[in-house]
Amino acid sequence: SGVKVYDPYHPKARDIYWNYLNKGIFQLGMDGWWMDSTEPDHFNPKDSDFDRQTYSGSFRSVRNAFPLVTVGGVSDHQRALTRDKRVIILTRSGFLGQQRYGSNVWTGDVGSSWDMFRRQITAGLNFSLTGMPHWNTDLGGFFAGSYNNSLGGGTATKNPMFHELYVRWAQFGVFCPMMRSHGADAPREIFLYGKAGEPVYDALVDAIKLRYSLMPYIYSTSWEVSHRNSTFMRALFMDFLSDPKTWNMGSEY
């Protein structure tokens, strides 16, 4: 957007970044961070942009680690300031080892379609296999604008085609490390999708209630993840390695 990003590879830059976050947000009281665009988002880049020098070398050579050092800087500073609040950072990008900073990575601004929904299962499994257990997806997809016009009359909140996709994605989200509804083009508040006694509303409420009923299990699994290097989403071959049929199975876990 014409704004030069900071150099997160430099410890002094991370200090400055944290000072702004601490004074403007953390000291006011908050439960967790939502750090978007940690790729970083880069509009209309020129090839020469990637040759700019950072504290650790050219941006081209270290750019993939941008989310690691950015998220790590916030996590380290918060933990140095207080141990009374666990670090949780929702972020759009990841790098190997980032799990140690309490980060939860989502699949980004994906389209609202059945094909993209199908791909989320594979994405979650592959991501978990890298050693990063905390993963999630925008329920219903992010870009839902097509359901406001070309794929049916009216708005997405009134469009049966989006209703079905949103409900099924929400039901999948129940069994993900984090269940989180978010997106553009269509609001996601469940009260906009009907009322008690109506199928879409009731299905969304049932999914949310089921998620809450699983909290003891999720909390116990979180302990296993943290202390025994476990994971939430387990590809079938992790438990049935001797069965070749599980090796390329990306539709269940």
List where the protein language model places each region.
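Catalytic-domain carbohydrate-binding cleft regions of carbohydrate-active enzymes
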Residues: 1-253
